[in-house]
From Swiss-Prot:
Gene3D superfamilies: 1.20.1280.50. This is Probable F-box protein At3g22720. Coiled coil: none annotated. It comes from the Eukaryota. Residues 1-49 form the F-box domain.
């Protein structure tokens, strides 16, 4: 029997079993359960086990798995049942934003709380936001550092904006705070995060993606009229400004992460052309080595909000947004190489454009992203 095997051999075998299969073993053997909770083992498992890549989508304030069938014409999207989590009234919790980090989801809710959630294990951790949270436009990101035992210590970055329209000219503030899971459960102001003045009060930062523990965000400098890539290092707790690829016509942009690759999509409002660049080189100080993906496609879909999922192997882009018009629709787009497919799939009822105001109290945009189940515990 496997339970009689030496522990090191059991560990070697189980470290190569997918996470969704391993979670069912937690209740079968006390010895295995202890191993699966070992943080050293979960780190080893994350790097050695097959990646069960899935596509998740935030729609109607809940998280849904979706599957895409490219073997039919036109391609189709199938929405599965919403993911559930350990909460007495989970169906009543309204999720307004989601940030993914190696199998953990950082969700913002409408009751001034954050929840860190591992859907694979069903574990959650609720975090109360500050009482004055609603005074700001806020962006949250989840990341981690590796401690001396090569185990992860998680942190949450809070980026906020404040506006004072009573002053002349109107004043705009920008601040950063951090929440450490290993601390006394309080928010800490970051005074030196912007050490090299990579951003200022004229910078607009968008919600980003997580890669290797750090957060990558798109940013826009109002004074310079330029876009750039911003990286927050959770170890040094500082921002770093990075270069984007050279686009012929800088337009609307989105970021995506899959299999330790960062993708940036650029969509031209002038030509309606879409192009994608990818990189997996993160060792340079400021200049990333970008590679252009040959996915030439035209899309007449002016966007208000959007998010991106890119599959390089299948040369397919999925993204969701609100289509422009007098009455706006929430739509999933499937776009293939050389206009191989182009399809719009509405996924909620039409809503009036007046409700699509960019304010932090109303969130109507949805998210689509790559998700890989993991055994990381929320500590």
């Amino acid at each position: 029997m496997m339970s009689d095997l030496p522990l090191d051999l059991v560990e070697k075998i189980l470290s190569r079993v997918p996470a969704t299969s391993l979670k069912r073993l937690r209740s079968t053997c006390r010895r295995w359960n202890a191993l699966l909770k070992d943080r050293r083992f979960t780190e080893k498992h994350f790097h050695k086990a097959p990646k069960e890549s899935r596509v998740l989508m935030l729609k109607e304030y809940r998280v849904f798995p979706i599957s895409v069938n490219l073997k039919v014409t036109p391609p189709s999207v199938d929405f599965k049942g919403a993911l559930g989590y350990s909460h007495s009234n989970s169906e009543q919790v309204v999720i307004t934003e989601v940030f993914h980090c190696d199998g953990l989801l950082l969700c913002t809710t409408n009751d001034d709380r954050l929840v860190v959630w591992n859907p694979c294990l069903g574990e959650t951790k609720w975090i109360q936001l500050k009482v004055d949270y609603r005074r700001y436009v806020s962006i949250f990101a989840l990341g981690y550092i590796q401690n001396n035992e090569s185990c992860r210590s998680y942190k949450i970055l809070w980026t906020w904006y404040s506006y004072d329209y009573n002053s002349s000219p109107p004043q705009r503030g920008l601040g950063f705070e951090i929440y450490e899971f290993s601390s006394d459960s309080s928010w800490r102001v970051l005074d030196d995060v912007n050490h090299d003045s990579v951003v200022n009060h004229n910078s607009i930062i968008r919600s980003g993606v997580s890669l290797k523990g750090n957060t990558y965000m798109l940013a826009y400098d109002i004074e310079e009229n330029s876009k750039f890539l911003l990286m927050f290092d959770f170890t040094t707790e500082r921002l770093k400004r990075l270069c984007l690829p050279h686009f012929q016509d800088v337009g609307e942009m989105d970021l995506s992460v899959r299999e330790e690759q960062l993708s940036v999509l650029n969509w031209s409002r002038i030509t309606s052309k879409m192009e994608i660049w990818i990189t997996n080189n993160f060792d340079t100080e400021a200049t990333l080595l970008w590679k252009r993906v040959h996915l030439d496609s035209q899309c007449n879909c002016v966007r208000i909000f959007s998010s991106l999922y890119f599959d390089e192997e299948k040369k397919v882009v999925l993204y969701c947004n609100v289509k422009d018009g007098e009455t706006s629709k929430k739509v999933v787009y499937i776009i293939g190489e050389d206009d191989g497919h182009y399809i719009e799939i509405p996924f909620v009822k039409s809503i009036k454009i007046e409700r699509l105001q960019l304010i932090h109290t109303t969130r109507w945009y949805s998210l689509i992203f790559n998700y890989v189940p993991s055994l990381f515990q929320i500590q």
